[in-house]
Design a protein with these regions (language model features):
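Phosphate/nucleotide-donor binding subsite
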Residues: 50-95
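Short, glycine-/small-residue-rich phosphate/pyrophosphate-handling segment
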Residues: 131-162
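Short, acidic/small-residue loops that bind anionic groups at enzyme active sites
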Residues: 110-142
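N-terminal phosphate-binding or glycine-rich loops at protein starts, especially the Walker A/P-loop
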Residues: 1-40
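Short glycine/serine/threonine-rich phosphate/pyrophosphate-binding segments
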Residues: 13-17, 82-83, 104-111, 149-150
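Conserved small/polar residues in nucleotide/adenosyl-binding loops
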Residues: 163-169
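Short beta-strand segments
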Residues: 6, 35-36, 59, 100-102, ...
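Short helix-capping segments at alpha-helix termini
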Residues: 25-28, 46-55, 166
Length: 169
């Protein structure tokens, strides 16, 4: 599995995300694409003795969407933001998954604009997998929307069913 990681959107800088990626590729059978300012990322990889780690690649992006920016406006304006670039990698099948610790709103907006929606689904939903002794349960939205209408609840049920089925193919 190849995972794109938006390392620039977080409040605390890319250090922990780059370190986590290094630890992940050394412990698990995965590859990681670090998306963000390549100069900063490469310096961190050197610091963590991972500059030659072949399961890590760096994909440069020159912009960042900050937590205080309006997600939809920022995603449209900042075409080279790390979350937008990472979403394009996912859309173009250059990775299998995407992780971001940045603005949730920006991640959702980038996914909506870059990946689209399931036909008939009006509102996106955030899925939270919860591991348990008997398997994994997926909770949709986890309190993110307080104004959901009945039709949105039905659409959320469809979305979580689709997500669960795709995850277990």
């Amino acid at each position: 599995m190849k995972i794109a990681v938006d390392v620039m959107g977080t409040d605390y800088g890319p250090q922990e995300l780059v370190l986590g990626a290094v630890q992940a590729v050394r412990a698990y059978d995965c590859e990681v694409v670090l998306v963000g300012d390549s100069e900063i990322i490469k310096k961190l990889l050197e610091e963590y003795n991972a500059a030659d780690e072949r399961k890590i690649t760096v994909h440069h992006s020159s912009e960042v969407i900050n937590m205080d920016e309006h997600p939809g406006i920022a995603v449209k304006a900042k075409k080279d933001a790390s979350i937008v670039v990472a979403t394009k990698l996912l859309r173009d099948k250059e990775c299998d998954a995407l992780v971001s610790s940045g603005s949730t709103g920006a991640a959702v907006a980038a996914a909506l604009f870059g990946l689209g929606r399931i036909r008939g689904i009006e509102r996106p939903a955030i899925a939270t997998p919860i591991p348990s002794l008997t398997g994994t349960t997926v909770v949709l939205d986890s309190g993110a929307k307080v104004d959901a209408k009945p039709e949105h609840m039905v659409q959320s049920a469809i979305t979580v069913s689709y997500t669960h089925l795709r995850a277990h193919e």
